[in-house]
Design a protein with these regions (language model features):
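Nuclear receptor C-terminal ligand-binding domain
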Residues: 1-146
Length: 146
């Protein structure tokens, strides 16, 4: 979802999505396939904010790493049983390092670095929420097809 949003910042505002294979998916096509509300949320809550902030590739990479090492409560419960105490400690250290790296990058590159860091972190909640909705849609579509 983060890559889709980042690529789509290059498209005309609010018109659609640039897919990984280079194709363009218009909002009308997304709506015709039952993705209208989801597409609208992606446009309004993620793509427009990334475009407004002029998100760069370094920030994108750090956000993706933060998402990877901070997967959420359901996944954390799995990690808690699968990881050793040392493994959990290392994961926590890596999370802290990633947040610190993003903050350091924002303050080094942007005049209002701390504010930008905060704005970037505020994108994590919508990214997680929309990702879960995408997953629900995929599961529902698969179940409906069977």
């Amino acid at each position: 979802l983060t890559n889709l949003a980042f690529r789509s910042t290059a498209a005309s505002e609010g018109t659609g999505f640039l897919l990984a294979n280079g194709y363009y998916l218009s909002n009308s096509t997304a709506a015709a396939h039952g993705l209208g509300p989801l597409a609208s949320r992606i446009q309004n809550e993620i793509i427009s904010k990334f475009r407004e902030m002029r998100l760069d590739r370094t920030e994108l990479a750090l956000l993706k790493a933060i998402i990877l090492f901070n997967p959420g409560q359901a996944i954390d419960a799995i990690y808690a049983t699968d990881l050793s105490t040392e493994g959990r400690r290392r994961l926590d250290v890596w999370r802290d390092d990633l947040y610190g790296s993003l903050h350091a990058y924002c303050t080094a590159v942007h005049s209002l670095g701390s504010a930008r860091f905060t704005k970037l972190l505020l994108r994590l909640a919508p990214l997680r929420s929309i990702s879960m909705k995408c997953l629900e849609h995929l599961v529902y579509t698969k179940l409906a097809a069977e």
